């Protein structure tokens, strides 16, 4: 499982111009079951994505297709962790 912290490196006006395409990117990967949570940070200087069920190299390939990455609007910091406990109702595979 991964926590992806996105930090904007461009002015919000430029980020906002790419926001619709970024949301479409998120939607595609929610539908594929890779992203399980996402949203803006407070204050709005970036965002956070939680991803699961994918190898790190594949995740890196996916993140490279984000319009924010393609337009060099943000930096991505990826932290992998082993979830050993999940809230009731989250039906995600836990690592062995």
Predicted features, each with a name:
Residues 1-96:
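Conserved, structured core segments of small domains
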């Amino acid at each position: 499982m991964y926590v992806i912290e996105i930090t904007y490196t461009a002015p919000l006006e430029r980020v906002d111009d790419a926001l619709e395409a970024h949301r479409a990117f998120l939607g595609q990967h929610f539908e594929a079951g890779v992203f399980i949570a996402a949203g803006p940070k407070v204050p709005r200087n970036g965002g956070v994505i939680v991803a699961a069920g994918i190898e790190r190299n594949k995740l890196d390939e996916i993140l490279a297709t984000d319009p924010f990455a393609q337009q060099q609007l943000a930096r991505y910091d990826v932290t992998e962790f082993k979830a050993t406990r999940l809230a009731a109702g989250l039906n995600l595979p836990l690592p062995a």
